[in-house]
C-alpha cells in the first residue's frame, strides 16, 4: 500500500466514525443502494451504535423535501380550480340571480337573435321584470306577441325564476322642451298643417 492509499483509507475511516457518531448508519460504498436516502434513526438508539446523547439526527427536516434519488420532489398543488371557488362564493353570497340577470343583459342578441336585438335594447332588470325599449312601435308590438317564446328561451338558458315578465316600451315621444327652464304650456297643438 502506498502513502496516498493509506491517507485515503485514514480519511475514509474518520468519515465512517463521524457518520456512526451522528446517526449510527455508515454507507457501504460497494453496495449500489449506498447513496439512497435513508430515514434517520431515532436519537439515542444505542443498540445500533448510537451514543444516546444529543448527537443524533434532528427529526425535523428543513427546506424542500427530496426523493430517494436526492432530487427535489415536485410541489403538490392541491388548489381548487378557480371556477369552483367562484361558484361557491356566488352561491354563498346569494348572487346567482343577479349574475343570471346580467347574463341575460349581455347576451340579449344570442337569446332573441341578431335581427330583433338590432331594434331592441335591454334597459334594466328589476324584481324579475325585464324592461325593454324598441326602435319603433311596430317592433314593440311584435315583441309583445313574441313575449311567451322569449320568456321560454330565457328560462332554458338561465333558469325559470330569473325573469318572470317582460315590460316592452316603444320609442320615447319627441320633446319640444328647449333649455333648462320650462313653463307649463297649453298642451300639444296641431302643428302639422
Swiss-Prot record:
Transmembrane stretches, start-end: none
Domain of life of the source: Bacteria
Region feature Disordered, mapped onto this chain: 17-74
Signal sequence interval, chain numbering: none
InterPro entries registered for this protein in UniProt: DciA-like, UPF0232_actinobac
Name of one Pfam family that matches: DciA
Biased composition (Gly residues): 47-56
Family of this protein: Belongs to the UPF0232 family.
Protein name, UniProt field: UPF0232 protein CE0005
Amino acid at each position: 500500500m502506498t502513502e496516498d492509499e493509506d491517507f485515503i483509507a485514514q480519511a475514509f475511516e474518520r468519515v465512517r466514525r463521524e457518520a456512526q457518531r451522528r446517526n449510527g448508519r455508515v454507507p457501504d460504498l460497494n453496495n449500489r443502494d449506498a447513496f439512497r436516502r435513508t430515514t434517520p434513526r431515532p436519537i439515542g438508539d444505542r443498540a445500533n451504535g448510537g451514543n444516546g446523547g444529543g448527537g443524533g439526527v434532528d427529526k425535523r427536516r428543513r427546506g424542500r423535501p427530496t426523493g430517494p434519488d436526492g432530487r427535489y420532489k415536485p410541489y403538490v398543488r392541491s388548489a381548487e380550480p378557480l371556477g369552483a371557488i367562484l361558484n361557491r362564493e356566488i352561491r354563498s353570497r346569494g348572487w346567482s340571480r343577479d349574475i343570471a340577470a346580467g347574463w341575460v343583459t349581455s347576451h340579449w342578441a344570442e337569446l332573441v337573435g341578431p335581427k330583433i336585438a338590432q331594434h331592441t335594447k335591454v334597459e334594466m332588470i328589476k324584481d324579475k321584470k325585464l324592461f325593454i325599449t324598441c326602435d319603433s312601435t311596430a317592433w314593440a308590438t311584435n315583441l309583445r306577441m313574441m313575449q311567451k317564446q322569449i320568456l321560454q328561451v330565457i328560462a332554458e338558458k338561465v333558469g325559470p325564476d330569473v325573469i318572470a315578465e317582460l315590460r316592452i316600451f316603444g320609442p320615447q315621444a319627441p320633446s319640444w322642451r328647449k333649455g333648462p327652464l320650462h313653463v307649463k304650456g297649453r298642451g300639444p297643438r296641431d302643428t302639422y298643417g
